[in-house]
């Protein structure tokens, strides 16, 4: 996910700066990502079946616990889908995507008023998170509200749950790694509802403000950084 966003930002910024159309960016991005996916599949053609069999084995051996974990994640997805905040932030972020798709331009119109911008708002030009959503809307023909309210929130929940599971498999290195990791995910999902006390907590972004990039930064990405730090510490420990 991180690599995907970095590649997209490098690809999108020149199009935004030169005031090219969303359609042009969509064509270039679709071609680029198609090539990347094909190359990745070819290079990992032996590992993909092995990983698939490994996941299938875990689901079969721990059917009940995996079922409970999946249900817990789906409940959070359902909650996040139905409880998105309605405020000026949601108006702006979803409005940017809608304006981009409707006008076939990028950051050339004010998302609040629809008035043409005399120049680029430099702070926003460097943030391509919403432009990526607009590209997805254009590729699949889906309305921006569906992408921003449903898809983005559910993707964040799933990525966060998977990252927490990764942390569990790294910390709990024993015979019951899978069981402990699954329990960690379930407990973490429950704690989000307890921690949702203010609109500025990572739980608030996770459950209610899922349309913002900060929802990913404060959850899936920060947990992934924790996972990398744990891996680094374990590597350093083994080297001494």
Residue ranges and their predicted role:
Residues 1-58:
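Membrane-embedded, hydrophobic transmembrane alpha-helices
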Residues 1-9, 65-75, 185-189:
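Alpha-helical transmembrane segments
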Residues 48-60, 169-180, 234-239:
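Membrane-interface helix-boundary motifs at transmembrane edges
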Residues 72-195, 199-211, 216-220:
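Active-site lumenal/periplasmic loops and adjacent helix-entry segments of GT-C-fold
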